Design a protein with these regions (language model features):
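N-terminal pre-ligand scaffold of iron-sulfur
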Residues: 1-63, 93-118
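A short alpha-helix capping/helix-coil boundary motif
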Residues: 24, 72-73
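Short cysteine clusters
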Residues: 49, 68-71
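Iron-sulfur (Fe-S) cluster-binding segments and ferredoxin-like electron-carrier domains
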Residues: 55-62, 73-84
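Short cysteine/histidine-rich metal-coordination sites, predominantly Zn2+-binding motifs
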Residues: 63-69, 82-91
Length: 118
């Protein structure tokens, strides 16, 4: 599959998150947290906190971070990297494209994190 409709721009105010149930090319369901940052940009990440089985779409959005409501782990929605313990594993991030009013997400093309060698 390619890009899929996750929501409409008008469905989300800045600083909010919502769950989108999408389907990958194999037919598997993929739960995605669509995030609209405080500055109005859209991001898509795997919905499940990597510390526990908790929906990140139910978390608080502050800037480009979403905080898991259960244990306080925070993730940078641009990279998926955890910003606060107890989570240490990043969440998947997915490409987002805005087409007019439509927020499109491609769950078959997760972004990869480029880390610099220390």
């Amino acid at each position: 599959m390619a890009e899929q409709l996750a929501c409409l721009v008008s469905d989300m105010e800045p600083g909010t998150a919502r769950l989108a149930e999408l389907t990958d090319a194999s037919g598997a369901n993929v739960a995605v947290a669509v995030i609209r940052s405080d500055d109005g940009d859209f991001y898509a990440i795997g919905d499940e906190c990597t510390h526990g089985e908790v929906s990140l779409a139910e978390g608080d959005v502050k800037g480009c971070l979403v905080e898991c409501w259960a244990h306080g782990s925070r993730f940078d929605v641009r990279t998926g990297e955890p910003d606060e313990f107890p989570a240490i594993t990043p969440v998947k991030t997915y490409p987002v494209r805005i087409d007019g009013e439509r927020v499109l997400v491609d769950v078959d093309a997760p972004k990869t994190i480029q880390k610099e060698n220390a």
